């Protein structure tokens, strides 16, 4: 009679707890011997077992026990100590692996981008060095040409100065010669012309 009474009470408790919607998700702990019971107490029979780390929906709580519904749509009672509000490593590992893969992919992309930028920077640096070397060579060439032009200008100025001096000397000699010849004619003409006059008079 007591067994029937307990069974009726358990059925009523179950039907009452089913109507309560907690809408709460918890996770079975890593305990390997996690058993489900038909009621909220050790006196109730074991209704089965549940895998560690499985997510379950909380329907009701009574004392040390919690009524849950698993992914197989089974409803049973489990010790509060066998539940956790944080996902187990079984649930977290795939997420962590996915995050690690995502981060690895991002790092790989960043590394690829960095390598491309490094190669581009090295190429530009090398190109700039080559252009700088060309400009330096052109600058040196222009300096050499400028020095050669200055030397030629100095030579031309020296030649021009020498030519000017030579022309001046030639003009000086020519002018002196003309002056000398004129002076000579000026001295000789007075002596030549009177003699002619005398000869004309005698005739």
From Swiss-Prot:
In the record, which residues are listed under signal peptide?
1-23
Gene3D superfamilies named among the record's database cross-references = SH3 Domains
Keyword Magnesium included in the entry's annotation? no
Ranges where the SH3b domain occurs: 24-87
Q: Which residues span the membrane?
A: 167-189
> Where does this protein have coiled-coil stretches?
none
Q: Does the keyword Acetylation apply?
A: no
Q: Which UniProt keywords apply?
A: Membrane, Signal, Transmembrane, Transmembrane helix
Membrane topology classification:
Single-pass membrane protein
Its Gene Ontology cellular component terms are:
membrane
* Subcellular location, principal: membrane
**Cell compartment(s), UniProt:** Membrane
So what family is this one in? To E.coli YgiM.
* Name of protein: Uncharacterized protein HI_1605
Q: What's the source species for this entry?
A: Haemophilus influenzae (strain ATCC 51907 / DSM 11121 / KW20 / Rd)
User: Upper taxonomic classification of the species?
Assistant: Bacteria, Pseudomonadati, Pseudomonadota, Gammaproteobacteria, Pasteurellales
């Amino acid at each position: 009679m007591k067994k029937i009474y307990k069974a009726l009470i358990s059925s009523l408790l179950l039907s009452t707890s089913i109507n309560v919607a907690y809408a709460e998700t918890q996770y079975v702990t890593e305990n390997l011997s996690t058993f489900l019971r038909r009621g909220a107490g050790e006196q109730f029979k074991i209704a089965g077992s549940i895998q560690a780390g499985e997510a379950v929906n909380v329907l009701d709580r009574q004392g040390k026990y919690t009524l849950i519904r698993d992914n197989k749509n089974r409803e049973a009672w489990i010790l509060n100590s066998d539940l956790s509000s944080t996902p187990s490593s079984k649930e977290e590992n795939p997420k962590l692996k996915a995050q690690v893969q995502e981060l690895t992919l991002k790092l790989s992309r960043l590394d690829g981008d960095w390598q491309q930028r490094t190669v581009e920077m090295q190429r530009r640096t090398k190109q700039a060095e080559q252009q700088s070397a060309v400009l330096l060579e052109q600058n040196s060439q222009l300096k050499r040409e400028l020095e050669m032009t200055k030397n030629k200008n100095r030579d031309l100025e020296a030649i021009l100065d020498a030519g000017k001096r030579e022309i001046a000397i030639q003009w000086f000699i020519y002018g002196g010669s003309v002056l000398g010849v004129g002076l000579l004619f000026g001295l000789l003409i007075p002596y030549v012309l009177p003699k002619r006059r005398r000869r004309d008079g005698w005739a």
